[in-house]
């Protein structure tokens, strides 16, 4: 008998639910939501697609194409949310301001939001956007888990060094409430660790599978 993380089966059944340009268009505020956030080109869409074994989130060579809150249903009461990519230079300033306004409204109002997965490019961590998200998580006591993405772009030693460095910086500035790991979509590095976080936040217990 082995123990299988039930979030794996749910993620494999993930399907697109709806897109929302503003909070009023979001699904009913009930159940469990986990939001995926990240600066443009941090590998957010690739991470989502890897965790769901599907091409749910749009990937593009032009970062910042995700302009809406995109909801993906795992079951009747659990959802993943792809938040707008933020910070790409080619996006007009008024559009950036629009994104930020509705991103802040979503983060500040959703009672069903159980945690935020924040993507950081392991080669360029702790941007101003990342720190803004960490500040918000601390102020609102929202659980946050960081994926240091694109870990395959660094050697094992360099990736570990970056992980330890970012862990230390976060601990000093934001306390012990933030967890962090290395992640690579192409290599599927760190996928099981990410699943465990999702299962915990969505209150799914490991179940024995015969």
Curated annotation (Swiss-Prot):
Q: Which PROSITE patterns match?
A: G_ENGB
Which residues hold GTP? Answer: 38-45, 64-68, 82-85, 149-152, 182-185
Q: Which residues form the EngB-type G domain?
A: 30-204
Keywords of this entry? Cell cycle, Cell division, GTP-binding, Magnesium, Metal-binding, Nucleotide-binding, Septation
Binding locations of Mg(2+):
45, 66
List, separated by semicolons, the cofactors it needs: Mg(2+)
The lineage's top-level taxon is Bacteria
CC annotations in GO? cytosol
Q: What residue stretch is flagged as signal peptide?
A: none
Determine if Metal-binding is one of this entry's keywords.
yes
Biological process according to GO: division septum assembly
The Swiss-Prot or TrEMBL record annotates one GO molecular function as:
GTP binding
Family to which this protein belongs = Belongs to the TRAFAC class TrmE-Era-EngA-EngB-Septin-like GTPase superfamily. EngB GTPase family.
Q: What does this protein do?
A: Necessary for normal cell division and for the maintenance of normal septation.
* Listed name of the protein: Probable GTP-binding protein EngB
